[in-house]
Amino acid sequence: INAATMLGQGKNVHQAEIDAACELIDFLRFNVHFAEQIYREQPNNVRGLWNKMEYRPLEGFVLAVTPFNFTAIQGNLPTAPAIMGNTVLWKPASRSVYSAYFTYKVLEEAGLPDGVINMLPADDGAAVGTPALESEHFAGLHFTGSVGTFEHLWTQVSDNLDTYKTYPTIVGETGGKDFILAHETANPKQVATAITRASFEYQGQKCSAASRLYIPESLWPDVRGTLFAQLDDVSVGPPEDFTNYVNAVIDQRAFDKIVSYIEHAEEDDDAEIIHGGGYDDREGYFIEPTVIRAHDPKQKSMREEIFGPVTTVYVYPDDEWEETLQLVDETSPYALTGAVFARERTVIRQAQNALEHAAGNFYVNDKPTAAIVGQQPFGGARRSGTNDKAGSEMNLMRWVSPRAIKESWDAPEDYPYAWNQPDAEGELSLDDIANAEPAEAGDGAVNA
């Protein structure tokens, strides 16, 4: 799986190892653990009653549509619903079929029964998606990919609502325009290293990659010096050479899109390329780590997801910290990940409050990538998805349809309530009712 991820998706050996081996293993192990926690969650019982929750699979199948950039996510999207008892149709990205094949073979060798997860590779996603979403048995969508594709699938689901037996579950993680925001008290070497890693690991092809930076004027010279020195030391080339830090982007279409942002920055009066900017597609789709400086904080590359080794920095006046917090929150429609660097607790708390909805995964003095299963449940809101937190019990709960079961061992045999039962000399009076002892907790019924 590691080798297929390196060769098929263009990851260096380290990125492939922490993805295809480590994170995929974590997803499988932790999801079993989370499922056990869910099943343990049972209601209280009282004398004469047995209450229980049954966590049923959805009534139908789940369609898992997976991305090219993470083999672990590619494996998690079909297996998470399957662990909760669902049948899954799995449409892997056409650009990562190699690692998807080995992932499926591993599941088969581990004993996965036939028909539980059904991998359906296709160059044309509609060949799988359209008939699946038109089926009356469609019960859920587990998706990671672009905003456009997710919204298209959601529209198809909406158009077919009358077809389905039950309202389907929709879980999606889409794009990000993830930020690093530094305060004047931040450690400049930590900030620079976070940029190098979060912006350029796996060529910036992570939905969590840092692609907009906000650095104060007083800190910028030191950050720039360390950052440029690190980038000058970074090697670019194929993953077969283990010394290469940056490899090729995934395909020609991605290459052309990323290059268009570099070319736009070269022509835009509100931006300038201050490092890198080179590219070559003669043999592979290679792009140098590129840093753009934006003089307008809402310049094109500060707002739009690029999904490549290009990041944009806006250098703000030190005395405009609060205004910059507002810029970070309002500039992008996404809200996936973000990081704040500062060494004052009051500043950190201020940023956490001001950016409450700007990132579903918020990092303090650390890069905004590499969420760890079981430690940082992953997902964002706004245009970044439904925020159902992969790598947690919150995600697994979306793939069950709970049923509450009440079993009575002492059911009543007559219909009247206690207060209207006649006594030996006649019916109860209102005074008798008013003076009656209150019922104990647990004797009442929930109004439903």
Residue ranges and their predicted role:
Residues 6, 25, 33-190, 387, ...:
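Rossmann-like NAD(P) dinucleotide-binding subdomain of oxidoreductase/dehydrogenase enzymes
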